[in-house]
């Protein structure tokens, strides 16, 4: 059996176990083949982004056993693949992850890399805040994208910040990124030129129906109902009360809301944000100016 054949057989096992995009994927992959390729290539120590060059490589019997063990764990525990491998990739950049953080998949990453945010920046842009940083992936990508800017990365979770520290150090950005323990903006100081935020925003009904893989992630980072609401907008309501005070005249807030556009528009009918185009459509990430938030 070669690598491609092993991946195809593994994908068939995942499908037979009932894993689908709606029930098991969506945390780095969207289908059984890609999920199987991730697990197989990682277990064999092969480059995850170059299947074609190794697809005909024979797989030893011992390697088959190792892959079988990993695949069995994925199916039996319903743990996300990233928690099993302790690694996730975002825009081609590797990040350490474990159960202390959600698995990075923010569409803001696309906007950083493809320069979609750049028209709102200027030579006066100096400071960036990544609010609700989680494992620090957006802060790292922002620091890579804008090498002349200082980046603050804030999160309420000390566990998440510990993982973010691993990733900041992994990419040699300790002198560029400052990690801050903060409940929202409470411990953030001064004004920022660009604020990125991928907050908890999942509504109560969606939280109740999450597949096991998503329930394995920290609920604090997913549920937007921490103050008793049900529409997923609790954190965002609090953010909008205070964020303008830490924005300059030309600062913009780039906010991710996942599949919650309908809830967002009902909660904030007076706002007219700019909606970015992403690989998932134009309902995922929005931009607001300070003028809109005062």
Task: Show where each model-derived region lies.
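Short amphipathic alpha-helical interface segments enriched in basic and hydrophobic/aromatic residues
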Residues: 11, 15, 44, 140-141, ...
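SAM-dependent Rossmann-like transferase core, predominantly class I methyltransferases
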Residues: 54-61, 65-148, 156-163, 181, ...
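A general structural signal for well-ordered alpha-helical segments in protein cores
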Residues: 7, 36, 67-68, 139, ...
């Amino acid at each position: 059996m070669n690598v491609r054949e092993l991946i195809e057989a593994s994908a068939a096992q995942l499908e037979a176990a009932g894993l689908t995009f709606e029930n098991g994927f969506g945390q780095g992959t969207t289908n059984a083949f890609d999920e199987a390729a991730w697990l197989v290539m990682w277990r064999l120590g092969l480059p995850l982004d170059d299947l074609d060059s190794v697809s005909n490589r024979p797989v030893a019997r011992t390697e088959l056993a190792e892959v079988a063990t990993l695949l069995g764990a994925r199916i039996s525990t319903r743990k996300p693949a990233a928690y099993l491998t302790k690694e996730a990739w975002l825009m081609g950049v590797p990040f350490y992850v474990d159960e202390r953080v959600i698995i990075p998949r923010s569409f803001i990453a696309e906007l950083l890399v493809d320069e979609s945010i750049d028209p709102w920046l200027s030579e006066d842009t100096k400071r960036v805040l990544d609010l609700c940083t989680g494992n620090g992936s957006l802060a790292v990508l922002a620091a890579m994208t804008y090498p002349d800017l200082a980046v603050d990365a804030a999160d309420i979770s000390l566990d998440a910040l510990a993982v973010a520290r691993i990733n900041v150090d992994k990419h040699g950005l300790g002198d560029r990124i400052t990690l801050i323990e903060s409940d929202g903006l409470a411990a953030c100081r001064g004004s920022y030129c660009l604020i990125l935020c991928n907050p908890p925003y999942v509504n109560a009904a969606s939280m109740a129906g999450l597949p096991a893989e998503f329930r394995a992630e920290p609920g604090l980072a997913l549920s937007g109902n921490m103050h008793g609401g049900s529409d997923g907008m609790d954190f965002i309501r609090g953010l909008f009360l205070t964020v303008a005070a830490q924005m300059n005249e030309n600062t913009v807030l780039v906010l991710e809301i996942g599949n919650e556009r309908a809830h967002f528009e009902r909660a904030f009918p007076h706002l007219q944000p700019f909606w970015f185009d992403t690989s998932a459509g134009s309902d995922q990430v929005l931009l607001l100016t300070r003028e809109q938030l005062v």
